[in-house]
Swiss-Prot record:
Main location: cytoplasm
Binding site for (E)-cinnamate: 267, 355, 361, 391, 463, 491, 494
Active site, UniProt feature: 115 (proton donor/acceptor)
Name by which UniProt lists this protein: Phenylalanine ammonia-lyase 2
EC numbers for this chain: 4.3.1.24
Subcellular location: Cytoplasm
Biological role: This is a key enzyme of plant metabolism catalyzing the first reaction in the biosynthesis from L-phenylalanine of a wide variety of natural products based on the phenylpropane skeleton.
One annotated GO molecular function: phenylalanine ammonia-lyase activity
A Pfam family this chain is assigned to: Lyase_aromatic
Gene3D superfamilies per UniProt: Fumarase/aspartase (Central domain), Fumarase/aspartase (N-terminal domain), Phenylalanine ammonia-lyase 1, domain 3
Gene name, Swiss-Prot/TrEMBL: PAL-2
Amino acid sequence: MAPSIAQNEHINGEVKEVLWNLCKKQNYLPLNWEMAADSLRGSKLDQVKKMVDEFRKPIVKLGGETLTVAQVASIANVDNKSNGVRVELSESARAGVKASSDWVMDSMSKGTDSYGVTTGFGATSHRRTKNGGTLQKNLIRFLNAGVFGIGTESTHTLPHSATRAAMLVRINTLLQGYSGIRFEILEAITKLINSNISPCLPLRGTVTASGDLVPLSYIAGLLTGRPNSKAVGPTGSKLDAEEAFRVAGVTGGFFELQPKEGLALVNGTAVGSAMASIVLFESNILAVMFEVLSAIFAEVMNGKPEFTDYLTHKLKHHPGQIEAAAIMEHILDGSSYVKAAQKLHEMDPLQKPKQDRYALRTSPQWLGPQIEVIRAATKMIEREINSVNDNPLIDVSRNKAIHGGNFQGTPIGVSMDNTRLALASIGKLMFAQFSELVNDYYNNGLPSNLTAGRNPSLDYGFKGAEIAMASYCSELQFLANPVTNHVQSAEQHNQDVNSLGLISARKTAEAVDILKLMSSTYLVALCQAIDLRHLEENLKSVVKNTVSQVAKRTLTIGVLGELHPARFCEKELLRVVDREYLFAYADDPC
């Protein structure tokens, strides 16, 4: 008799538990379940603080397995750092790198057949050759197919910050000793980075599978001294390969690539993952910044602070939402504006809305999932920049070359598409808040367009800024469309599916730039709103003092010196002052 569904589930559950306990006992987790779970534990804010601390460190030490998004961003932004930052290679990696390089040379001499060493490339891998060095030289030649504009910073040249980051990521991969390349080549690339010399790479031309072949070939072209190779020096001047080597202090002349070395340099996801690292470093900071801006928005809008109540968010269970609410609650705690708003809400409560609009009240619920997406993408990219992502992989311990597809940059394309959608959602909420802030129908007593001029018929404040914000938000929403569903079969249908990782990362970089524009505009508007609330507070204080003094003189004592019942009108008059929107004069037709 066949077992029931319930029996099957019970048996499967016991098997899973036995396997799990066995894995834990032997310290063997083949799918890294526990590591993946641990990576998303803890506070997102603490993670961002740690990222900023790492970004500020003067040295990036590479060993192949501990590179972070913040370190990649640090190398990318070396132009903007007063003290610079240097890369150091782990000497302990030298032996493993040398072993894989020696294995390739030994296998070549023994006649072992390996892809890209004795064969052609891609769809033409059926071809064979014994001229391994010449094969690598021609690999670089045919991959140098990029198109550049005029000048060192043309719109068709990859930003030099991204190039430096890509060199760092590629070194980190090659240090792990599975790629068959000499350690001296990695040292030369390190010298280029430390001298702030960036090879000129084309902005476009890669599908990030098989890796970022075309752009990475220009790094290889500089190392081998190809005549078309150009670089940009520390002062922004254009250098040829010979000048770049001299400035960087690379001695011994250009490299004559040995078998597999050209493939090791170009067949990886370094450019896409480097750009993604830069994007995610900034995205994490922008997400935290918007949590702060949302709290300020609640403050200047006289919002009801209960939207951050811990029980509400605890019952929803989502960690991003819980932390966003906690951060906003911390910022609002003790705010004099919040206390003043509480008094206003208690005055004539039945004549006012019971709760705030969604842009304020549900901001933690809206932001939380976006923050979780950005955080998950950050972890995915950190795994990618510490991965070995070329082909074939040299396994010296088993004396074999493994042919696979780690060059497929799907983690980059998917994480960047998701990040871009999260950024667009953040921008959407920001625009909704901005629209409420400048609209006197919604902003609880602030002047229309946040104007503070004497003549409201001439001063229109943030009207132009609101139009600009609409433009930014529209473009940001367009960029939220995915890139990865636009795959085209490439290279004679060998690369019939590809990740489009760098393209997606580039589009996400555009989204980050637009969100920066929105954030800076919004911050200025919030500062204006704070000033207006402070002005409102001061003016009300002056008016109330004046009303109180006049009331005491004119309403307290009668003609014959007796106490006048009208003295009790003082409290009512002061309440009228509190109820009145101070800036209502701006649209008063009188």
